[in-house]
A protein has these predicted regions:
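Secretory/endomembrane lumenal or extracellular ectodomains immediately following the signal peptide
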Residues: 1-77
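Short alpha-helical scaffolding segments that buttress acidic/His motifs in well-ordered protein cores
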Residues: 49-52, 62-69, 82-88, 117-118, ...
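Conserved alpha-helical segments that form or flank metal/cofactor-binding pockets of metalloenzymes
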Residues: 60, 81, 87-107, 111
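Alpha-helical scaffolds flanking conserved acidic
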Residues: 75-83, 161-165
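C-terminal end-helix/capping segment
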Residues: 103-113, 117, 179-191
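A contiguous pocket-lining binding segment that forms or flanks enzyme active sites
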Residues: 107-136
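Acidic/histidine-rich alpha-helical segments that form the ligand environment
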Residues: 127-157, 161-167
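Acidic, carboxylate-rich catalytic segments that either coordinate divalent cations
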Residues: 153-155, 162, 171-175, 179-191
């Protein structure tokens, strides 16, 4: 995980958002909407939402794309979190890793799974379907493509749409990790 504690681009405090900016971000991802109500008694806005508020049109589009993958995808929640956490670890994104630990646990990943996600190699501790998912994540991070052998193994478990979903999910979270790492967004940042 990156060790830089300096934020190059701090989240925009919710008190500074216009109603138009809030409206652009709202309605794209149900998980995010609870933070976008503008209600003073609402939950604290996570730093990533404040970051997206700095460019609401791009932030809203990002939330919409994420919503399609997270809320309308066909992968099991556990598999989705497995992939996201692997990307978080492999890209050294402290924010991504820390934000998805609880989600991964809620989705069924146990402490041994979470520790194994930090291993540099994918071992037989994972059942075959998970092993192929992790291999896809590793190959996309390392090589920006999936090998024929991994593709073939993945197709034993997933249909075409699910394979595309895996590719888009990993790719989108690699992109997000690059943004988070570059701007210096870390879990301990507060609004």
């Amino acid at each position: 995980m990156t060790n830089d504690a300096v934020s190059r681009l701090a989240p925009l405090p919710a008190a500074e958002w216009s109603e138009e900016e809030r409206a652009i971000l709202r309605g794209n991802l149900a998980r995010a909407d609870r933070y976008l109500s503008g209600d003073p008694d609402g939950p604290p806005v996570p730093p990533i939402i404040g970051l997206l508020a700095r460019h609401p049109r791009v932030g809203g589009a990002w939330l919409s794309f994420s919503g399609a993958l997270i809320e309308h995808g066909s992968l099991a929640e556990r598999e989705r979190e497995l992939l996201i956490l692997r990307v978080g670890h492999r890209t050294r994104s402290r924010y991504l890793w820390s934000q998805h630990l609880a989600m991964g646990t809620e989705a069924g990943l146990d402490p041994h799974d979470l520790q194994a996600l930090r291993d540099s190699t994918v071992t037989d501790r994972w059942h075959a379907r998970d092993r192929h998912l992790l291999m896809v994540a590793d190959e996309l991070v390392d090589d920006h493509t999936v090998s024929d052998a991994t593709w073939s193994g993945l197709r034993d478990y997933l249909d075409e749409q699910q394979v595309l979903e895996v590719l888009f999910l990993v790719g989108s979270y690699v992109c997000l990790a690059m943004v988070l790492n570059s701007v210096g967004l870390h879990p301990e940042l507060k609004e």
